[in-house]
Amino acid sequence: MLLVLPVELVLIEGKSKNMERARRVLEMKGITKQYFGNTVLNNVSIDLYPGEIHALVGENGAGKSTLMNILFGMPVIHSTGGFSGEVLIDGEKVELMSPAEAMQAGIGMVHQEFMLLPGFTITENIKLNREPTTKNALSRLFRSKSLDYLDVPTMRKDARAALDRLDLAIDEWAPVAGLPVGYMQFIEIAREIDKKEVRILVFDEPTAVLTETEADRLLESLRRLAADGIAILFITHRLDEVMAVANRITVLRDGETVARLNRDEAVVERIAELMVGRKVEKVELPPRAKEPSDEDIALTIDNLVVDMPGEMVRGLSLSVRRGEILGIGGLAGHGKLGIANGIMGLYPASGRVSKNGENIPLNSPEEALSRGLAFVSEDRRGVGLLLNEPIDRNIGVTAMQVQHKFLKSWPHFLPALRLEDRAELRAYAEDMIRKLDIRCLGPNQPVRSLSGGNQQKVCIAKALALEPEILFVSEPTRGIDVGAKRLVLDLLVRLNRDHNVTIIMTSSELGELRKVCDRVAIVYRGRLAGILPPDASDAEFGLMMAGRVGKEAV
Amino acid sequence: MRKFVIGLLVVAFLVSAIGVVGTAAPAYKIGIVTGTVSQGEDEYRGAEKMKAKYGDMIKHVIYPDNFMQEQETTIAQITGLAADPDVKAIVVNQAVPGTVAAIRQVREIRPDIIFLLGVPHEDPELVSDTADLSFETDQERRGVTIVQLAKELGAEKFLHYSFPRHMAMPLLAKRADIMKEEAERLGIEFIFATAPDPMGEYGIPGAQQFILEDVPRQVEKYGKNIALFSTNCSMQEPLIISALNTGAIFPEQCCPSPTHGYPAALGLEITDEMKGNIPAILKAINDAIVEKGGAGRFATWPVPTNYLLVEACVEIARDTIEGKMELSDLDAVKARLEAAASVPMELRRLPEKPDGNFYLLTSGSVVFGRDEF
Amino acid sequence: MTDKLKQTVEHIGIPRLMIAGFLAVIFVTAYITGMSVPQLLSDSLVRVGMNGILVLAMVPTISCGVGLNFGLPLGVLCGLVGGLISMERGFVGFPGFFAAIAFAVPLAVVVGYLYSVLLESVKGQEMMVGTYVGFSSVAVMCIFWLMAPFRNPELIWAIGGKGLRSTLTLGNYYGKVLNNFAVFEIFGIKISGGLIGFFLLFCLLVYLFFRTKLGIAMLTAGANPVFAKSAGIDVRRMKSVGIIASTVLAAIGIIVYAQSYGFLQLYMAPLMMAFPAIAAILIGGASLQRATILNVIIGTVLFQTLLTTALPVTSRVIQGDISEVARLIISNGMILYALTRSTGGK
Amino acid sequence: MIQSPEQKKVESGRDVSLDMRHIVRTNGVPILFLALSITMAAVAGLSPAFLMNEVITRFARNSLLVLSLLIPVTAGMGLNFSIVIGAMSAQAAAIAVTLWGIKGVSGFLTACLLATPLAAITGCLAGLVLNRAKGREMITSMILGFFANGIYQLIFLFLVGSVIPFNSKSMLLPQGVGVRNTVDLINIAQSLDKIWRPVISGVRIPVVTVLVSLGMCVVITFLLRTKIGQDLRAVGQDMNIAEVMGIKVDKTRIIAMILSTVIAAWGQLVFLQNIGTLNTYNSHEQVGMFSIAALLVGGASTRRATIFQALIGVILFHTLFVVSPLAGQKLFGVPQIGEYFRVFVAYGIIAVALAIHAWQDRQMRKEAIREAVLTE
């Protein structure tokens, strides 16, 4: 996709020079934050001028959300020991202990998930809990503001004004339910700018759910708001958008500020490199007897469409070599997670998927499982585990249901009524606990009380019980500590090498993909952007994730 | 707009309802209000009998099974009868709560309708002031007669089962007090036991199960010569069964009638020729009791009270409307009652309201295995 | 070890400790006032046996994720019809009892299936809809009892000669067959091996069922529907099976109940049948998401013992009968407690 | 919901131009029951004057109770079965007024005054309980009603006369403890109805009582247009969003319960003054059941209910109640079958209405998903 820079951008750039001299509206200095001993932010600083659009970019887990949580005084920050460093607004040090205080200080936030009531009109949503009221006889009698009438004309006037500032011609009294997603985003923004005191607006990945035209309109509004003197902090993955609107760009990586660029110094390639770049400690992976090749294809995906909210797959085709570890990368929202979920029948899917030439019927987990596919879900606690059940039940249940494992052999004719073979299951679970080094009190322990890493191992054990030919693993290291991460990755490599399992591993952490995979496929907007070798340069990965190179890079 | 359309439909419906309706009539009608058979077969069948006898002259409607909660429906059923201009008299048996309210409402538009009640549940004095005529078994007298009968059957103790809701009914509470006095006078130990309320949330089964469990306990404690009595209809079957099994004495049901409790408790076979044939039913009960070894320990009235009350009320209503009698004429009332019962009856007025038409009735008893059938 | 101890305490829970304490007070009082404690215990055991299977009927619906089965009267009605057909056909004794079950179960399967189809279409409102479906089906069956073509002269009304009586005596048919089977005495406590054994047999059957492939699939579907889906389990079907199982158990439960009780109760009697069963399983420590056989046994024992002993004992001690009202408050208080406690359920 | 001229224009332009299919789809429940009522009225063959009289009396008697359900629905708490608590408060007040012998309208007003704080306190407690059972409000409020019934019995059967002083022998049981099962409310009987009750072509209209109900509609409309009303609606739509937006969700829900309970208490007093006698231990038991049935028949759902639906619901439900026993009797030829038929209809109504709504919700959600997929 080629990017056409709008003409007025030049003007904004011109302005930015002047702004250097203007007073900063926000400064966050030397912010350091630890969660349970893990440093997630290390001496991060960022500042904002009135009328500036400041882009904050970084991979998942780079620390953007934590920084914003600090700015908003979220309870989660204070309940976990606070942070060090200081926040200044208009040059004065502030201590924001709650979102309400942040709001009072003039900070507005456009939420990623819409905080809109579908049954209310646009006006009612914009003025939610800030409704202007007029007195009436009863409210005077009881001296209660609660009994004041809503001042509907003023509400509408205010809402109209806010919508006009965004150049939104929609009827302010239309109900929100049924509006296109893009409009909802604008209503969120309108609500923020309707707050008279708002001078700083934070946009947290606002375009993630928008179509291209909607995204363009949103960027347009951003510029408009900046022109009105509002300082904007713009968090996004989409580098082309950054290039289109940002005056300055701050790149976060692993909780540290790696770069701060002015618009004129920045090029997409450079930002991408800064975002993903990290010293990849290339470990020598054990060799195989026979290296996988295109001659021997295990799984063919053809024009796969998956309707997974937030991770739509829109016609993806891909071939997986037998015996390889294939990585699937890409930015959040581009559909990399939808692939495995679609093939495994968890979300509505269409297209053609075949294993060894045999067609796999879609939309049925049972069909996929019984054909030697297995899946370790990214949603460990939601999809992957029965939290209140013991380890052995978690490990065995899928294999039991799909392959009649761990069951007594009687009655032959009615497998549904065969009893569970406790001894066999227990023995298997104990074996797995030993092999995967699951730290627990025994196979009877409910998995809820296990640590994240051990829970993940239970998930993998569950998939292994199926003895799969092809294993899908999504976000295998999400939310587990560093030591456990390595163990999990090692485990996957061992499975691949020792048991010849073909692994398709989806991850938001490019680093780990590059560490263990034979090839890394990058997904962009629901389609395959290209496949790179793990040792391709940071810039190549960055560009491909930003959708800046065509297909067939390999 | 949408509201308008619905509103229009409602109006259209009410208008159409007016068009649909239209009734032709005989000279006058009598309304009868009873419960369903599951509440008590006697009064329902009494109404059926009257319906069979007088045909269209009788309008029979039902109050709800859970009449305690659905007063409004009872009221609507009664006022519904009164809405028919041909209805000149309404018989309510049993007169469950809500009847007084209904009568008051009807009086405002139809002061001409006479109300005849059987077994009123509400305050007797209140009922006496409202209804034109009421029948109730003479609870105070029965307080004496039942205990005397028990003594006659060999009782040394007298066990009285009830529960808060019934003891909140003044007549029943008073009767219990009288029973106690009479028992003490006769040298019988009076025992008051609490049972679960069958109208409570565990319902009739819970109450019945309690009786089945409690009677053996009591008999073990007090011996076989104990007379059992309960204020609640649904407890009669388990009481009779337990009395038969333990050898206790059962002098009378709450609502005295051969068909109340006995047929179900004894698993009586009702052949075609027995249907509605009281003497035949009495004989069959007698045979069953004797066979099970209960001779001389079980008794009841020879007539199904509620059954005959419906008949008596209808006849009294007819004769009153046709000017053949006065409701305040105790002898005339008694004559019609005895005609319906075909056994002698004793009748008196409620002592608290000597000038009202609240009549209290008593009948002699028949003892199974002793009397001739 | 401390974990185990903590778990045990958690398992017992405050409400159960309270009720157990209350029961202890009652038994001590009974002893002091000279009541026969073994007799009270015997009565309580009978109650446990007769109510147990109805309580057990709650387990499948809770396990498959539908929640408490407020539609229990549906199964009860099936059981009553089965019991009636057996009587109409003149079966006596154990054959009568088993014939009743044999007639009732297929009916319950059909009714349970239809009920599950209905509940599937009202997801999220299962308990409310269940309550009212139960209520209205009782009324429909009232009409059925009046019109049904039963001819057995022992079943019909005395004066009218048609329609079924509201209370049918089972004495000549299969009344007390279980209760009188294998009766023995320990320490003066009369125990009916037949009745208690039958209840425990069903506990065992249900326990084993939840150890089969199907049962585990159902548990999984109830515990985490998304997990179940990802494990290739048809969640809808599991709910169906759970509701059918519950309905069948209710049908068998009412037959056991009736034979012990000695009567079949028709008309409005089944209306409130669900409530004591629900109270019992909640008192036993079950939540809206999870119920075990142990919950059933503990709950039934505590609740039924409370019902059986509280009234006769307290009415000895205090004049009047506050115990009847106290029972109302305690049992509803327990359900309320459970509803306000269990978290996470949506 | 507040409507602006534009909104109406949009509606009339789009889908209300007598599009019968749309009307049937969105009002399936009331139309079903309207059809049922007409059929049954035709079968029952009641006199129109009687039917009108009966329906108007019942409308006057019950509409306030049904209206009391609206606010909790608006606040997203579903159908409030615990209005029986309000009814109990009202009965306590009615008993007190009878005891003190305050007659006529002043007696009625005294009872209202007395019932209000009682209902407010109990309603607040109910709100606290329901806040701990979010998502299960309906079944919880139902059990709460049963529970409160136990407390009520404890007070009036055992404490009155023993712990609570009570000096009227005629209202107490013979043994001096506990209130009798029927209390004659002669002092306040029909006090409101009697003020002005003209007869128009055979139909007696208790004008003042009807006006009270309509007045309550105005009050509710007023409330919903105030700041607190807006909060209630916001909480009703999505508790989490409301919380994030700084609305005190728990407090708002408690206010909803207090309002509902207080209105229910007044409603029960209107009901009792019309009936004229009080069934001490049972009058309140079915209040929640029947009011809810009426509201559902009017087309309300557990998530959305309007004043109009409440009023239409009262009329339809009670028409059905008046005609169904007779219709059943005529249809089956046996009076008691008619009665069971009526019970079936009463309970069945709620089951069917809940089922239809749940089904409609699912259909709507499915459509929303389909649309979302299409726009992609």
Annotated model-derived regions:
Chain B
Residues Q71-K88, Q105, P205-K224:
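Short, well-structured alpha-helical segments in soluble
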Residues A47, Q139-F192, A317, E338:
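An alpha-beta-alpha
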Residues A27-M50, Y54, V61-I75, V91-P97:
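Extracytoplasmic "Venus flytrap"
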Residues S134-H160, F210-E213, A280-I289, P304-I321:
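Hydrophobic alpha-helical segments within soluble ligand-binding/sensing domains
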